[in-house]
């Protein structure tokens, strides 16, 4: 657990991140260390989930450093963008100078979240056949870069 930093400060007046688990690096799979969180309102109500992967490699260019999902009843409130801002804070603790977030080209809401959170669109990339996202049916991702 020495690699992971405290997360109690990941909150604002609108959202907070509650750590659910961490995952050590698994180099044989191309996985970097990761944090997994519930996204919650200040009263503790769970409204979604997010994760932060620490590091950079070819697999993460496609999969991204950050993933998020907001429960349907809570969508439209910019909670994902607010959670991303908190994840950026955690990424800075690890010395990351930038993070990548990717989304399916058909997911306009996620692309909008990337724009609201300050991402710079880089490209729409083809997913390699050996990537786990390809196995799950995805073929392309929009790639956004966020300077930290």
Name the predicted role of every residue range:
Residues 68-70, 76-93, 112-116:
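Conserved acetyl-CoA-binding loop-helix of GNAT-fold acetyltransferases
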Residues 102, 120-136:
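Conserved catalytic-core motifs of GNAT/GCN5-like acyltransferases
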Residues 2-61:
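Acetyl-CoA-dependent GNAT
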Residues 44, 78, 95, 107:
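Conserved G/P- and acidic residue-centered "switch" motifs that form tight phosphate/ATP-binding loops
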Residues 91-102:
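Conserved GNAT acetyl-CoA-binding A-motif
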Residues 34-36, 138-143:
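Short hydrophobic/aromatic beta-strand or adjacent loop that forms the aromatic wall/cage
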Residues 106-123:
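Conserved active-site alpha-helix within GNAT-family acetyltransferase domains
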Residues 38, 51, 65, 69, ...:
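Conserved beta-strand segments that form the floor/walls of ligand-binding pockets within enzyme
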């Amino acid at each position: 657990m020495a690699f992971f930093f405290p997360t109690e400060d990941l909150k604002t007046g609108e959202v907070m991140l509650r750590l659910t688990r961490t995952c050590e690096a698994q180099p044989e799979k191309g996985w970097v260390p990761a944090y997994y969180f519930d996204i919650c309102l200040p009263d503790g109500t769970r409204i979604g989930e997010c994760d932060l992967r620490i590091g950079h490699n070819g697999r993460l260019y496609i999969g991204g450093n950050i993933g998020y999902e907001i429960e349907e009843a809570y969508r439209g409130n910019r909670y994902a963008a607010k959670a991303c801002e908190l994840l950026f804070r955690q990424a800075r603790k690890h010395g990351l100078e930038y993070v990548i977030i990717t989304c399916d080209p058909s997911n306009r809401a996620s692309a909008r979240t990337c724009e609201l959170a300050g991402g710079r669109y880089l490209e729409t990339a083809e997913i390699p056949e050996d990537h786990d996202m390809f196995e799950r049916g995805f073929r392309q991702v929009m790639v956004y870069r966020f300077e930290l």
